[in-house]
From Swiss-Prot:
Alphabetically ordered keywords of this record: Lyase
GO MF, any single term: lyase activity
Protein name: Putative hydro-lyase PLES_32121
Organism: Pseudomonas aeruginosa (strain LESB58)
EC annotation from Swiss-Prot or TrEMBL: 4.2.1.-
Top-level taxon of the source organism: Bacteria
Metal-binding is among the record's keywords: no
UniProt keyword Lyase present: yes
NCBIfam families assigned to the protein according to its UniProt record, in alphabetical order: PRK05463.1
Length: 265
């Protein structure tokens, strides 16, 4: 049976898409998939870090809008889907160990520990369908790429040991589209809401748009301005500063596609 095209993947309902991912039949990015369904960033920490991280999310709701938290040891997000298993239902994960480079895998079952707590954090991929419905084209989708993401100079509010930079995702738009995009995305605070910044990237510490820290470069036309939204990769940048002994995250751009609609929250 031939592999499904990306267009065919985009038409699949989330439970079917997750089954495909669970079997290891798709390991690519999820931008443009799930259509109107919420996508979630993933952070998995040992229980000793959970309360601190929960407070960090509460202090930084633009970057870390919390959609669900698992019980210790449970790999399930009951609020997001009946059959979700965070050990296998994302296309790619990063396993982070102190002092080592992250390892990317497509299943984390062998790494799972009894005291793990999983956090689902809202993702801007969720509001992309609303932008498309408003007639706003998205360059990274047109090019079949992941979105471009950057470590900014915008500091997060610290929580105990957790502090560091806000990561932002960038989408280039014309001025009229930018105004409409702000109006549209401000309706969805649980998927990062309105942009944190638009215009000169140097003002938020980004030197070169052609060299994103995560994701793929997305070209900017002469008549466009870059818009920057808070991004759920922020926890990875912050945790890299403090280096817990072990934690697991999604690989940037490779999200959990849930059964919840983005406009239900």
């Amino acid at each position: 049976m031939p592999e499904p095209t990306f267009h065919e993947l985009a038409q699949l309902p989330p439970p079917v898409l997750r089954q495909l991912i669970r079997r290891g039949d798709y390991t690519g990015h999820t931008s443009g998939l799930g259509q109107r369904h919420l996508q979630a960033n993933l952070v998995i920490l040992q229980k000793s870090w959970a309360d601190e991280f929960l407070r960090f999310c509460a202090l930084n709701p633009r970057a870390c809008p919390l959609l669900d938290v698992s019980e210790p040891g449970s790999p399930h997000f009951a609020r997001l889907g009946a059959d979700i298993d965070v050990r296998s239902d994302l296309p790619r994960y990063r396993v982070h160990r102190r002092g080592q480079e992250p390892v990317e895998v497509s299943d984390i079952g062998t790494f799972w520990e009894a005291d793990f707590v999983a956090f689902a954090i809202g993702c801007s991929f969720s509001f992309e369908q609303a932008l498309l419905d408003a007639g706003i084209g998205l360059r990274h989708l047109e090019l079949g790429r992941n979105v471009a993401m950057y470590r900014s100079s915008i500091a997060t509010r610290p929580s105990g040991r957790l502090a560091g930079p806000t990561v932002v995702s960038m989408r280039p738009l014309k001025a009229a589209e930018a105004i409409r995009a702000i109006q549209v995305t401000s309706r969805f605070p649980m998927t990062h809401g309105a942009p944190l910044h638009l215009g000169d990237p140097a003002l938020i510490g980004i030197r070169d748009l052609a060299r994103p820290d995560y994701g793929d470069p997305v070209p900017l036309a002469a008549d466009e301005i870059p818009l920057f939204w808070a991004c759920g990769v922020t926890p990875q940048a912050v945790l890299a500063e403090v280096q817990p002994e072990l934690y697991i995250s999604h690989a940037p751009g490779h999200m959990l596609v849930s059964d919840r609609l983005y406009d239900e929250l």
